[in-house]
């Protein structure tokens, strides 16, 4: 296990180099889905917290999600359970916060996420831990299309972020032959919604990393690299009205011309305007690209310099 961030003001992300190398090589993760849904320790807090957020003007709605109930390992089935977006709001999203649940009762979200100041295995975690996914998407010319998050976004509003980000829905897992396939399918769906990608365009996504985000209670996330067939200028349409509050616009970088180092310098220059999700995803892409015998350089068409 390793920590990605070495900066004091950056969140911490933990990962396992061996697992990520296996994912980059295309080794699938099988899964076993439970019918028993996850329940938070204090289910009564759900209605109270949702009512508070809606009273604050937050336009939130619930949806079914997929929870990781065991740590991933190459060749081993990952245990999954049904959960929901709202259940994450009273578990993972309380991390680094103290929540006044009611008169006389204060909930320390950090202690619940990390009992005894330790990061629990996913099998022992009492967080909702619904699975997230993010991707960097390149076209045939090596151009990278990034999103600018809108004011309604729950995370990193107004920041430049990755090409697509979201979470795994029940529909993504139905019929999937592996968890990694379900993640890739979810990323394709998010690309259509967030970049305006024509849904008839072929997309190939390779999963390159699995991480857990400490500032969100150890929430699990997969990082991918996507290749679209065509040019963003031709297949990147405008987003629909429902997505506009969440995606304000787009930034396109000529990554093939800039090279990995050039994009890295651009990210450093724009550090105040970019999300941690984008910076960390690029770091994992850089590591996967540099691995001996990596297929990424030829696949995305980007050199180091």
Each language-model region and where it sits:
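Short alpha-helical functional segments enriched in proximate histidine and acidic residues
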Residues: 194
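N-terminal leader/linker segments that precede catalytic domains of diphosphate-processing enzymes
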Residues: 1-189, 197-305
